[in-house]
């Protein structure tokens, strides 16, 4: 009874101070996403790590370490660049092209790539050199992400005779279906299908390639939580994003994607010394992401800070809550869907207190590239033009009213503001305030970006050395168009087109290579200026045309020095890397506890420094036994302080200007990573044992809590240190084993059985985490105490198992 009374009184404690994740827009943290499709692709490939392609070796250890939160050389996975014939594509398209047999190359570092000017980010490069795929059907029992998958791929030569020629038309196809619940994390499931076809031909002076792909998926995703919630439930896969509805599990966070994609290229030799290439890519994506929301009601998120024992200073209340969590009472540990329905049904006017919204993004991406390669007086020159058009429309849709009749499309935070209480309508263009299921509400806007670039790369040899010099000059135009006219920012302040931002990115890189005998040396330099993401150029893109102050390019200065040794049984690589980023920016949206209102914060003058050494080795111990190893030891830190300018969200008035003491903080990228494996291949048996270690890592730091305005507000040095100190995460380790056996049934027919055990030791690894921007004030013995909100973390999977059966014919 005491617990019920406590929760009933909770709404009157700090109703206005909700976590920004609870009420409205919050950033889609990329590190929280489980890349289920990559796991499915690896299962379909079986023991692809045992292949002969060095690119596949690198990708394998990169993938295994990324499951522990690894980022190669301090560069996050989502920053990687994927290209096909020098046009940018998505990671999803890259993976499907690989499944269609299109050759790929994994390029690390800052060297030039496929004729363009290199960048610091890693590249997966595809070119029209398709492999002939033997027909194969593959079935997998996964358990992680989804339960089952079934795939088929094959290629055919379209010839009228029985003789297969190199210049025949080649048709390749790939189909993958997957479905079912996650067996390791409650509330997760994945359903999806992928279809891809490609058609290509090489003939006398021409090469033509076309590919069409249609991926679709619908899956639930995990939500980061606090370590307190995990420890209370003793469930390292605890997921607060689901609950029971009429006795059945229901997730509040469901991601859906449909992305028809076309890519193509045409190459023609124009003479003895010149080749022309025309390549293009088009993707039209429909993406949705549901979330539970509420109006004039208590938070429905079970791990909200006010629902955890640590929030209460009363021992009896804290004890009862602790018991409820430790016994995993789903009424407290998960979303109470039935209670949400009941709350909506008793609303006097039929409006929704709780509802499910769908944050939709309709994207169109078009890329076109025309380049030429010419050999002139011993210099290989590649030059061309590239155009990219990207248009993203963001809007919210009422997904489920949870038994209510309608939703009021108003800004509840403005309505409760005494100054702006009469300007609460989200869209003056609408004829009614009520929104029904399927209606747009909240916000509706488009961000458009058009870029044109010219580039050139020259490669030549002199004194037994190779040189490369590349230049890339671009112009980028970005603007916003609002389809809703928010009453708070009426007319062109929110509706219609914004002022366009024009930036001029540029890159310059130089590379030197020298080989003698079994040894090779290289050195690479890069200077670049890059445009920020479109959403970072607006103070609040959801409903405001206002630009951030002085939009400008971020800059990068990078250098790498490498050495490699190759012999019959051993290959070694060593790379020293250094990259310095300056003038980076970010925009944050959160509830400011000192100002007691929602704010938009522009963070500028961000500086980062990544430096370290990466060692890689591959050894062939015998005819059947081989090993690979990699160690990366670096320092990935913020440098100096950053400027944080905070504006009130309701009127853009200046709230505060302060410097953030972010210098010295880890960028949330691990500073130590180790991979080692041993592989055995004999006859039709294959086995792989690998060990992964990721250490010296921390949660992503908050710029806000480190501002002078916030940490000097704390009354004691100890509490100031708590706001400034960055949580160090424990080292993450995993031991993985894979085993495969191929049974040859006939000349061209076989069955392959594969078994993979990941994280065999069942270690509980935190894969990512981040600091929240909020602080709380607590009165203890009539004395005020200030402390930061608990960090949000995500634990990786424990011991998992995958079984794959493939039939080739």
What are these regions (language model features)?
Residues 17-20, 693-714, 741-809:
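C-terminal beta-signal and adjacent terminal beta-strands/loops
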Residues 24, 47-87:
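Extracytoplasmic beta-strand/coil segments of soluble accessory domains associated
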Residues 53, 89-91, 95-140, 145-149:
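A beta-strand signature from Gram-negative outer-membrane beta-barrel systems
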Residues 146-220, 252-275:
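Transmembrane beta-barrel wall of Gram-negative outer-membrane proteins
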Residues 207-268, 290-357, 420-435:
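Acidic/polar loop-and-plug regions of large Gram-negative outer-membrane beta-barrel proteins
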Residues 213, 365, 386-390, 395, ...:
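Structural signature of Gram-negative outer-membrane beta-barrels, strongest in the C-terminal barrel
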Residues 218, 224-234, 431, 477-478, ...:
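Surface-exposed extracellular loop regions of Gram-negative outer-membrane beta-barrel proteins
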Residues 461-464, 577-580, 585, 597-705, ...:
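Gram-negative outer-membrane beta-barrel transporters
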């Amino acid at each position: 009874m005491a617990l019920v009374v406590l929760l009933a009184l909770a709404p009157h404690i700090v109703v206005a101070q909700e976590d920004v994740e609870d009420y409205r827009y919050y950033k889609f943290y990329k590190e929280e996403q489980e890349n289920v499709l990559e796991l499915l692709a690896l299962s379909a490939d079986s023991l692809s790590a045992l292949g002969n392609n060095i690119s596949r070796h690198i990708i394998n250890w990169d993938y295994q370490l990324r499951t522990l939160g690894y980022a190669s050389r301090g560069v996050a996975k989502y920053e990687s660049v994927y290209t096909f014939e020098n046009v940018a594509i998505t990671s999803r398209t890259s993976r499907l092209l690989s499944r269609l047999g299109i050759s790929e190359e994994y390029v690390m570092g800052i060297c030039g790539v496929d004729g363009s000017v290199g960048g610091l980010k890693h590249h997966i490069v595809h070119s029209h050199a398709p492999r002939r795929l033997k027909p194969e059907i593959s079935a997998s029992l996964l358990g992680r992400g989804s339960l089952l998958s079934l795939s088929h791929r094959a290629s055919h030569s379209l010839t009228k005779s029985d003789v297969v020629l190199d210049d025949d038309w080649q048709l390749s196809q790939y189909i993958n279906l997957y479905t079912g619940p996650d067996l390791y994390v409650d509330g997760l499931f994945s359903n999806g299908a992928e279809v891809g076809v490609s058609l290509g031909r090489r003939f006398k002076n021409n090469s033509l390639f076309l590919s069409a792909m249609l991926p679709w998926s619908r899956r639930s995703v995990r939500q980061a939580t606090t370590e307190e919630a995990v420890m209370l439930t003793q469930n390292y896969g605890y997921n607060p994003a689901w609950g029971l509805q009429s006795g059945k599990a229901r997730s509040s966070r469901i991601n859906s994607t449909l992305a028809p994609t076309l890519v193509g290229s045409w190459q023609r030799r124009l003479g003895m010394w010149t080749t022309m290439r025309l390549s293009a890519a088009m993707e039209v994506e429909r993406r949705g992401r549901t979330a539970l929301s509420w109006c004039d009601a208590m938070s429905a998120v079970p791990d909200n800070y006010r629902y955890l024992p640590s929030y209460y200073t009363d021992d009896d209340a804290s004890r009862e809550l602790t018991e409820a969590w430790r016994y995993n009472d789903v009424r407290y540990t998960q979303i109470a869907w039935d209670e949400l329905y009941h709350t909506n049904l008793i609303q006097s006017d039929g409006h929704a207190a709780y509802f499910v919204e769908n944050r939709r993004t309709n994207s169109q991406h078009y890329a076109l590239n025309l380049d030429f390669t010419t050999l002139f007086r011993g210099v290989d020159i590649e030059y061309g033009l590239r155009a990219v058009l990207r248009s993203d429309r963001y809007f919210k849709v009422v997904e489920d009213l949870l038994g209510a009749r309608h939703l009021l499309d108003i800004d509840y935070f403005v309505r409760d503001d005494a100054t702006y209480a009469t300007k609460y309508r989200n869209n003056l263009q609408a004829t009614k305030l009520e929104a029904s299921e399927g209606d747009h509400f909240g916000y509706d806007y488009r961000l458009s970006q058009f870029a044109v670039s010219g580039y050139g790369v020259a490669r030549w040899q002199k004194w037994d050395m190779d040189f490369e010099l590349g230049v890339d000059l671009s112009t980028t135009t970005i603007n916003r168009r609002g389809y809703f006219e928010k009453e708070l920012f009426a007319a062109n302040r929110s509706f219609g087109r914004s002022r366009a931002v024009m930036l001029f990115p540029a890159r310059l890189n130089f590379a030197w290579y020298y080989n003698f005998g079994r040894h090779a040396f290289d050195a690479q330099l890069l200077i670049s200026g890059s445009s920020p993401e479109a959403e970072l150029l607006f103070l609040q893109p959801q409903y405001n045309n206002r630009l951030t102050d002085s939009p400008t390019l971020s800059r990068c200065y990078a250098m790498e020095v490498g050495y490699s040794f190759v012999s019959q049984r051993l290959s070694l690589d060593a790379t020293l890397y250094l990259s310095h980023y300056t003038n980076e920016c970010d925009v944050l949206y959160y509830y400011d506890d000192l100002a007691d209102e929602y704010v938009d914060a522009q963070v500028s003058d961000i500086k980062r420094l990544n430096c370290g050494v990466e060692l890689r080795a591959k050894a062939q111990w015998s005819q059947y036994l081989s090993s690979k190893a990699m160690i990366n030891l670096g320092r990935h830190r913020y440098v100096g302080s950053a400027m944080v300018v905070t504006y009130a969200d309701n009127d853009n008035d200046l709230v505060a200007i302060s410097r953030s003491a972010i210098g010295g903080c880890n960028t949330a990228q691990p500073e130590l990573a180790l991979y080692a494996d041993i592989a055995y291949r004999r006859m039709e048996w294959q086995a792989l044992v690998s060990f992964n270690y990721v250490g010296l890592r921390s949660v992503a730091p908050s710029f806000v809590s480190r501002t002078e305005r916030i940490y000097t507000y704390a009354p004691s040095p100890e509490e100031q240190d708590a706001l400034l100190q960055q949580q160090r995460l424990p080292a993450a380790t995993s031991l993985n084993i894979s085993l495969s056996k191929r049974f040859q049934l006939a000349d061209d027919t076989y069955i392959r059985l594969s078994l993979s055990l990941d994280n065999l030791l069942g270690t509980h690894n935190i894969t990512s985490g981040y600091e929240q921007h909020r602080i709380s004030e607590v009165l203890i013995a009539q004395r005020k105490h200030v402390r930061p909100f608990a960090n949000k973390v995500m634990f990786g999977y424990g011991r998992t198992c995958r079984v794959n059966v493939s039939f080739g014919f």
